């Protein structure tokens, strides 16, 4: 039965080429615009190198530091002291890292350059949380970190700019005119991996500006924390352990009280949660309230046009449908036939829509993501994309062909045969 419907659909495509092209292009455009929204969400949510384990990550993007007399309130990043007392001692996670971002001029001892690069000051745990692919060398070690030695890992593009085809391992680079020895070279991370992205990574203990911070009585600083759980089931245990660590920290009677109220999962961040204005956690309700009207608009506008096209096509076959009903075809079978035949068109449009959505994302990434973000195959082609494409294709098929199919199925045999 379905094989016959498929043959009939192909025959209709050949007979009504203009109508078929309009239907396919309308479907492709609708699906592509919807998938751009899906892709943007997917890039913010799913894992890809060097953030392959996003589903197991927790993020501390900010803290509160309030004076005990309530005269001073700060929403900021944490100091290295908070990191050492509240994050490093955690027992439940697999790994913990603290990260401070900066921009600085990177040059060579014998060649002065003036271009700024992104530098992440971090710790050895960084290389456990993120899965960078090393082209040569290795990360800076625990001993380097403990001793505050000026060691760096650099991205491959920067390595080529500075050293050409030479091996940079063991050579010095100047960061803010201070010599640092290169210990490793990694593949360039995409800017979409914002937490991991940089051109240079160095131990924060090698920079005195990040050690022994005294702002807000030693609470405020430059660091954000990222925690890699062994399993998502450990999230609540980790949050509880953090609360206990914060309570112990505040029990010391410091001038400022530390607040670490929000420990976000990757899903929280993808849904729009942030630490601005004291911290806001958003769920699916808030996300869909913002996104659903756009998706509905993108779905319904082409649906109305496609419904007219399908209706016109069905009208030409009223006599055929009436004849089938006269020979015993049920309303359900006629309904399934129209839906199946139209599904061929929507599936073709859906496949084109997937390709078109990737092209649209690439062309429009300057305002959808950031202009410098490299959109990679690993980021885009996930099961989420194909599941979303299939869902919206089937939904579009049901909406555009459903009404004409129901109408033709309900029509009286005599009216259909007489084409009234």
Named regions from a protein language model:
Residues 12-45:
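Short, strongly hydrophobic transmembrane alpha-helices
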Residues 18-29, 304, 319-365, 388-396, ...:
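Transmembrane alpha-helical interface segments in multi-pass membrane proteins
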Residues 37-107, 113, 220-224:
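Membrane-proximal extracellular/periplasmic loop immediately following the first transmembrane helix
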């Amino acid at each position: 039965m379905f094989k016959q419907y498929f043959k009939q659909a192909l025959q209709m495509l050949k007979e009504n080429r203009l109508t078929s092209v309009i239907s396919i292009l309308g479907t492709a455009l609708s699906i592509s615009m919807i998938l751009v929204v899906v892709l943007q969400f997917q890039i913010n949510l799913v894992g890809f190198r060097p953030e392959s384990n996003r589903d197991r990550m927790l993020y501390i993007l900010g803290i509160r530091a309030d004076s005990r007399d309530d005269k001073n309130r700060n929403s900021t990043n944490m100091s290295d002291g908070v990191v050492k007392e509240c994050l490093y001692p955690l027992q439940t996670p697999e790994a913990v890292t603290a990260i401070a971002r900066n921009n600085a001029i990177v040059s060579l001892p014998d060649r002065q350059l003036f271009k700024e690069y992104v530098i992440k000051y971090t710790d050895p745990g960084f290389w456990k949380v993120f899965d960078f692919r090393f082209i040569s060398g290795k990360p800076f070690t625990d001993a380097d970190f403990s001793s505050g030695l000026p060691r760096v890992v650099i991205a491959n593009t920067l390595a080529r700019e500075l050293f050409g085809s030479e091996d940079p391992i063991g050579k010095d680079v100047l960061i803010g005119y201070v010599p640092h020895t290169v210990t490793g070279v990694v593949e360039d991370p995409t800017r979409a991996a914002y937490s991991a992205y940089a051109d240079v990574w160095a131990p924060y203990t090698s920079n005195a500006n990040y050690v022994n911070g005294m702002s807000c009585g030693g609470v405020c600083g430059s660091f954000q924390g990222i925690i890699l759980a062994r399993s998502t089931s450990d999230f609540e245990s980790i949050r509880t352990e953090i609360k206990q660590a914060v309570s112990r920290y505040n029990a010391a009677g410091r001038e400022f009280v530390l607040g670490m109220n929000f420990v976000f999962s990757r899903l929280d961040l993808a849904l729009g949660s942030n630490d601005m204005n004291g911290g806001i956690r958003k769920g699916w309700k808030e996300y869909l309230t913002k996104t659903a009207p756009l998706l509905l608009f993108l779905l319904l506008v082409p649906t109305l046009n496609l419904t007219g096209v399908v209706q016109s096509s069905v009208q030409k076959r009223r006599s055929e449908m009436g004849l089938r009903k006269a020979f015993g075809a049920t309303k359900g079978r006629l309904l399934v036939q129209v839906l199946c035949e139209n599904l061929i068109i929507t599936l073709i449009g859906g496949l084109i829509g997937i390709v078109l959505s990737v092209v649209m994302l690439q062309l429009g990434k300057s305002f959808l993501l950031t202009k410098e973000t490299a959109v990679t195959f690993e980021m885009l082609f996930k099961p989420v994309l194909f599941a979303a494409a299939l869902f919206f294709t089937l939904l579009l098929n049901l909406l555009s062909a459903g009404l004409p199919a129901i109408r033709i199925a309900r029509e009286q045999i005599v009216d259909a045969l007489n084409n009234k």
